[in-house]
């Protein structure tokens, strides 16, 4: 089963130092999975909260599927439950509370017939760390240009 990436959160790796990642399923309605298959999803502004030992994806934009005749109107920015094992949720929650870390969505992808979300535990970068990242990226680009010509 191959993975087919639908949406990336590029800002997450720039703003956070990712320490650990997990794969989580997402609780979706039928028209939402069709929208995801049509690449009409955005997780750039999304974040993850844990309430009452359950993880939720908040502010992820999954467009309304045009051809669906769904009785309830689905809000594109609705809160969606993430499917994780209790042990995983407890481990994440413990690290968030003790080490003051943030849970960020990294990428949304299809694995077989299921939509999965890769979530990461990250520590916020300071401004000087971000500048270092930009410098490293520029150096790598210059190196690649040398080898290209």
UniProtKB/Swiss-Prot annotation:
Keywords: Cytoplasm, RNA-binding
SUPFAM superfamilies hit by this protein: Small protein B (SmpB)
InterPro entries per the UniProt record, alphabetical: SmpB (IPR023620), SsrA-bd_prot (IPR000037), SsrA-bd_prot_CS (IPR020081)
Gene Ontology annotations for the cellular component aspect, listed alphabetically: cytosol
Record-level Gene Ontology MF annotations: RNA binding
GO biological process entries: trans-translation
CDD domains recorded: SmpB (cd09294)
Subcellular location: Cytoplasm
Superkingdom field: Bacteria
Gene3D superfamilies: 2.40.280.10
A Pfam family the protein falls into: SmpB
Predominant cellular place of this UniProt entry's protein: cytoplasm
PROSITE patterns to which the protein is assigned, alphabetical: SSRP
Stated role: Required for rescue of stalled ribosomes mediated by trans-translation. Binds to transfer-messenger RNA (tmRNA), required for stable association of tmRNA with ribosomes. tmRNA and SmpB together mimic tRNA shape, replacing the anticodon stem-loop with SmpB. tmRNA is encoded by the ssrA gene; the 2 termini fold to resemble tRNA(Ala) and it encodes a 'tag peptide', a short internal open reading frame. During trans-translation Ala-aminoacylated tmRNA acts like a tRNA, entering the A-site of stalled ribosomes, displacing the stalled mRNA.
PANTHER family associated with the record: SSRA-BINDING PROTEIN, TMRNA-BINDING COMPONENT OF TRANS-TRANSLATION TAGGING COMPLEX
Family recorded in the similarity comment: Belongs to the SmpB family.
Name of the molecule in the record: SsrA-binding protein
Species: Mesoplasma florum (strain ATCC 33453 / NBRC 100688 / NCTC 11704 / L1)
Gene behind this protein: smpB
């Amino acid at each position: 089963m191959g993975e087919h990436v639908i949406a990336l959160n590029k800002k997450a790796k720039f703003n956070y130092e990712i320490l650990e990642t997990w794969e989580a399923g997402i609780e979706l309605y039928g028209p939402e999975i069709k929208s995801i298959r049509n690449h009409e999803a955005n997780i750039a502004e999304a974040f993850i909260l844990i309430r009452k030992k359950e993880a939720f994806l908040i502010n992820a934009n999954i467009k309304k599927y045009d051809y669906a005749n769904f009785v309830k109107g689905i809000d594109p920015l609705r809160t969606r439950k993430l499917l994780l094992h209790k042990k995983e949720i407890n481990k994440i929650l413990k690290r968030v509370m003790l080490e003051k870390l943030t849970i960020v969505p990294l990428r949304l992808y299809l694995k077989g017939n299921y939509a999965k979300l890769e979530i990461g535990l990250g520590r916020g970068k300071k401004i000087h760390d971000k500048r270092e990242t930009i410098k490293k990226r520029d150096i790598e680009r210059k190196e690649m240009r040398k080898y290209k010509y």
